[in-house]
Amino acid sequence: MIQTQTYLNVADNSGARELMCIRILGASNRRYANIGDIIVAVIKEAVPNMPLERSEVIRAVIVRTCKELKRDNGMIIRYDDNAAVVIDQEGNPKGTRVFGAIARELRQLNFTKIVSLAPEVL
């Protein structure tokens, strides 16, 4: 579960390394976000000489959480870190590569471009 002030790793090569969640999109008083939710975040750490810079406000979709994800078939998935992929206003990823495994639920939420870039889909 991701809430405001939560730090996340960036799972793509967009230029950001670490994000801090400042808003969860959806409802006006939504407290937690899970895999597949879109958040508004600020870049806390960035790679030098890249298009994204520190303290820039961006949108991102959550691809991994430490909190368990229960599937309908009884399977439980848990990751070692909280990670997100930076997206633009249309929902397309800003980077050209995605690092690490991502959940299959992103395909059902119409993030097919992120799923196609991922090396492993669980």
From Swiss-Prot:
GO terms of biological process kind: translation
Entry-linked Pfam families: Ribosomal_L14
Classification via CDD domains: Ribosomal_uL14
Keywords (A to Z) from UniProt: Chloroplast, Plastid, Ribonucleoprotein, Ribosomal protein, RNA-binding, rRNA-binding
Coarse class of the protein's main subcellular location: plastid
PROSITE patterns: RIBOSOMAL_L14
InterPro entries, per database record: Ribosomal_uL14, Ribosomal_uL14_bac-type, Ribosomal_uL14_CS, Ribosomal_uL14_sf
GO terms, molecular function: large ribosomal subunit rRNA binding; structural constituent of ribosome
SUPFAM superfamilies: Ribosomal protein L14 (SSF50193)
Subcellular location: Plastid, Chloroplast
Segments crossing the lipid bilayer: none
Subunit structure: Part of the 50S ribosomal subunit.
Function recorded in the entry: Binds to 23S rRNA.
PANTHER family associated with the record: 50S/60S RIBOSOMAL PROTEIN L14/L23 (PTHR11761), LARGE RIBOSOMAL SUBUNIT PROTEIN UL14M (PTHR11761:SF3)
Family: Belongs to the universal ribosomal protein uL14 family.
Name recorded for this polypeptide: Large ribosomal subunit protein uL14c
Organism (species): Piper cenocladum (Ant piper)
